Amino acid sequence: MKRFAAVSLAALMLLTVFASAASAADVIEIRGPVYNGSDINDIIDTYGENNALTIDATKFAAFYYDIDDNVTTETLSILAVPGTEGNVIGEGGIVYETTIQQVDYEFYRPAAGWSNYSLIGFFAEKYIPINPDKADKLAKLVLDSDDKYTIRTGEQLDLGEGYSIEAKQVDVDGEKVWLEFTKDGEFVDDEIISVVSGSDNTWEVELDDIQDEDDVVVLRVHVNQVFQGAVDSIAQIEGLWLIDYTNAMKIESDDEFGNLDNVKINGDTLTITNEDTFTLTRDDEEEIAEGLFFKTADDTRALRFYAMKQITEPGTYEIRGEVAEGDFSWDATNFAGFFYDVNDDVSTESLTVTGLNGGNVIPEGGLVYETTIQMVDYEYSKPSVGWDQFPVLGFFAEEYIPINADKADKLAKLVLDSDDKYTIRTGEQLDLGEGYAIEAKQVDVDGEKVWLEFTKDGEFVDDEIISVVSGSDNTWEVELDDIQDEDDVVVLRVHVNQVFQGAVDSIAQIEGIWLIDYANAMKIESDDEFGDLDNVKINGATLTITNEDTFTLTRDDEVEIGQGMFFKVADTAASDLRYYPFVEKTIDGEVVDDDEDDDNVTEPVDNDTEVEEPTEEPTEGPTEEPTEGPTTEEPTEEPTEADGTTPGFGVVLGLVGLLAVVYLVRRNN
């Protein structure tokens, strides 16, 4: 009996150790249009045409799109084929198709040979066809940049994915530079580039045997200037283009991509369909292929779903709305940045442009942002114990909670709404994000109650003893006063699932957490300004903000609307207009640098006026460093005193406990 108890305790401790060590990664979801109907055929009839529902890049922000050239390559279609009924898509009813297109280099200089190149979107990633007319051999695009980078001789310019170029030497006349191209530190090619008048200043690296293709251009470098000084020898690069040729792939007709397994290649077009039926399972995410999913609502009365792509890599990402060419209106169904609850079919925000009249100037009052408080279910949805619904308000693409459920003037950001299970020992803290934490102080000897403490930035806020005996709701609500002059404001809800008092460990299991950032709550006044939106009206549960002055959609520019929301406007002729709204979302974390141990690696710097030590790493398009974003965090079950170099308290305690159990078992033998 003693051995059984000891082994059982060991198993529980081991489970707890691993539960404490686990934490959910941040995820950005880029969704397509929301489709809602009685069944799949009703949705195709309502939103599609000719028995087909088709999504392209103008509607689905994950697909590749060049707004300046209005170029898309990918489409995802649902067809009304035999077997398509209810929530089932028949065989061959999902069609993913992508076609090679020509796009301009970011460094656009046709006279110098930098005009356009072949590109194909492949499951929402940018690829380059090895053969510009065939879609079967592809390499990912690593870099397409028109930034200026300055490097000294002996320094390397990190291009990403292990590729780099080094300025070996500059000639004494300052007219030529010797560049070397490497992959993972290994030599690939080198060239002496002249910058004298009449030369195109461009180095093209051509390699053979890339997926059995020869003379494949894998790198293009345009050298702008060369400088030979008394101290420094410097090359200035403007124009970089690179493909990941070492990981090029060949697509075969018998390849499978998730649930898409019927591959057809017809010249520059790649088509992939499903050989088996595909079920849109309610309250689930079903992978289509290669990180693309259909997300379906938990609603038995209707069929509601959207296509989406999940991103987990650290970085900053643009989430855009549907592309417009004149007056337009966006809500959560066509702008993925806006808050949307698919299960409850709840959205709160809209953005409307009127009065363009063929031009690019929005008149006074023609730009209207509006948001209205709505009720949504808790993630931990248990109405019988008081976890039913709460009020929410999207505010410039972020999720906020109104301090007063009926007024949209006082808001606090939603930090956490989770139904995950978290196990903490006494003395340990559960980090809730934004400096908030709860700690299990003690468990009573009968294992029926736990004493929890709530803190902000390490300072005491409140505490409570929660009972888990039959008949109690096991929920702790923290109510605070004077939150933007409001009293009895619920700022935290915690549901305790179980309490365990063992010989070694005292443990509380939490399932159900809801938290608002009350410390940074804000009040919106009628004279507030949000970017170019400066006419604020609050009418009960609805907040409306418009522009008092005219608003110009400047071509080839990003124009801020307000609070980090922008319009991106295409570089078109004066007679045309093309634009979309977007926000940026960030996943925190460090990007692994393969060359971080090299002391002589130079990261690029964008520098037009003077020579400086390069510090900027090139990326496709604008350089974006990951920053601490305002996104909702999942709790990480780590003691706050643990750091990245030493084991957490939970792990050490678990190991000590296991050794003790082994000792007890051996002694009992």
Swiss-Prot record:
Alphabetized, the UniProt keywords read: Cell membrane, Cell wall, Cell wall biogenesis/degradation, Glycoprotein, Membrane, S-layer, Secreted, Signal, Transmembrane, Transmembrane helix
What Gene3D superfamilies does the record tag this protein with?
A: 2.60.40.4190, 2.60.98.40
| Residue span of region Disordered | 588-648
Please verify whether the record's keywords include Cytoplasm: no
Q: Mark out the compositionally biased spans (Acidic residues).
A: 590-627
- Annotated S-S bridges: none
Q: Which InterPro entries match?
A: PGF_CTERM (IPR026371), S_layer-rel_Mac (IPR006457)
Pfam families, A to Z: PGF-CTERM (PF18204), S-layer (PF07752)
Q: Which domain of life is it from?
A: Archaea
Q: Where in the cell is it found?
A: Secreted, Cell wall, S-layer; Cell membrane
Q: Which family does it belong to?
A: Belongs to the Methanosarcinales S-layer protein family.
Any idea what this protein is called? Answer: Major S-layer protein
The species this protein was found in: Methanosarcina mazei (strain ATCC BAA-159 / DSM 3647 / Goe1 / Go1 / JCM 11833 / OCM 88)
- From which lineage does this chain's organism come? Archaea, Methanobacteriati, Methanobacteriota, Stenosarchaea group, Methanomicrobia
